[in-house]
């Protein structure tokens, strides 16, 4: 409802629930003083609502931002969603939780590993899935900017009823690589490419925005070192 929309906006979009970044060659003390005078030291609508709730004997937590809790991994055997599209547009996905947003090394390592396994038609796991004739193409994506980073593997132009078979082929291919190893040259090439990208930070946006987004990917989840 409209009232729920207003309530959600008041809970989350206010200075007490904000993250502020400063970037560039500026007078930090002057910038902070300006922010404090204009915004941070002034009672916000959210704080006034909270004070009114306390004065009325109400539970102030009902006006606080909604909590974001870590969820236990869920093993979903099979979930099907019907969509109004042609069969050629069918997608089958496989998602894997990588850990915590605070474990950046693990997330970067997982991104490198999945690039080695699925990043090209010659990548061993992608090659195995395509050879099985389950669909037209395989793409993977590492979602690192969340509380629980995850890897999403998607099979495009999927054949009917192959969801469980996709999981089996994926797991068998990974099991084989655990026994025989991932080609060292491939891993070294991907590590070098990732190192270059991380150093260059060429994301097509302003440097300050890129750095702020990178910091927020863990700062939002209580990483004081961000």
What do these predicted regions represent?
Residues 1-65, 82-109, 115, 121-226:
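Charge-rich, well-structured scaffold segments of protease-associated domains
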Residues 77-80:
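Membrane-proximal cytosolic interface modules of multi-pass membrane proteins
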């Amino acid at each position: 409802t409209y009232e729920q929309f207003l309530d959600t906006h008041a809970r989350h979009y206010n200075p007490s629930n904000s993250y502020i970044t400063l970037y560039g060659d500026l007078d930090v003390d002057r910038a902070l003083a300006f922010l404090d005078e204009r915004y941070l030291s002034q009672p916000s609508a959210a704080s006034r609502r909270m004070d009114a709730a306390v004065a009325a004997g109400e539970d102030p937590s009902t006006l606080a931002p909604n909590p974001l809790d870590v969820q236990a991994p869920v093993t979903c055997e099979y979930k099907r969603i019907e969509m109004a599209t042609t069969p050629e547009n069918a997608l089958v996905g496989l998602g894997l939780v990588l850990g915590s947003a605070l474990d950046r090394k693990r997330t970067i390592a997982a991104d490198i590993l999945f690039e080695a396994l699925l990043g090209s038609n010659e990548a061993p796991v992608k090659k195995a899935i395509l050879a099985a004739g389950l669909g037209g193409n395989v793409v993977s994506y590492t979602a690192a900017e969340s509380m629980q980073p995850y890897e999403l593997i998607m099979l495009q132009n999927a054949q009917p009823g192959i969801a469980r078979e996709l999981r089996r082929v994926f797991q068998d291919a990974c099991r084989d690589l655990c026994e025989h190893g991932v080609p060292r040259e491939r891993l070294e090439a991907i590590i070098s490419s990732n190192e270059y990208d991380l150093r260059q930070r060429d994301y097509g946006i302003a440097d300050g925005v890129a750095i702020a987004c990178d910091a927020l990917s863990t700062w939002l989840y209580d990483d004081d070192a961000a």
